[in-house]
Amino acid sequence: MTLTVRVIAPDKTIWDKEAQEVILPSTTGQLGILGGHAPLLTALDTGVMRVRAENDWIAIALMGGFAEIEADEVSILVNGAERGDNIDTEKARLAYEEAEKRLQTSESSDNLQEKIKAKQTLKRARARLQAAGGMVN
């Protein structure tokens, strides 16, 4: 049984195709979706979404949002998203390393906003690098 999967960001549609399976980074953990799933509305965390379409897995970096799931349809509204095959792995790796350094620097600061922003930047950089295929813990 297939699903119609749509990933929509404010500036463009990232994905609008049929798929056999979807794995989403919800705020409570990974969520696997197959055809015939019970209706669900869930918040999404920054992370990597995986879509199995035509027996290939496609990775998409999501920057938080919401997913509405029906029996055969998954609609995903996100703050930002990028397909892994459109991400330059080396640039993503450099951005991740820079974000790690920024977080380490912010840890010695008393500025709470700076710490939060550094953690968010690292989380986004990690999602992009993972979606591009550059493994990160």
Swiss-Prot record:
Keywords: ATP synthesis, CF(1), Hydrogen ion transport, Ion transport, Membrane, Thylakoid, Transport. Its main location: membrane. One of its GO terms (cellular component) is proton-transporting ATP synthase complex. GO terms for molecular function: ATP binding; proton-transporting ATP synthase activity, rotational mechanism. It is found in: Cellular thylakoid membrane. Belongs to the ATPase epsilon chain family. F-type ATPases have 2 components, CF(1) - the catalytic core - and CF(0) - the membrane proton channel. CF(1) has five subunits: alpha(3), beta(3), gamma(1), delta(1), epsilon(1). CF(0) has three main subunits: a, b and c. Produces ATP from ADP in the presence of a proton gradient across the membrane. This is ATP synthase epsilon chain. It comes from Trichodesmium erythraeum (strain IMS101).
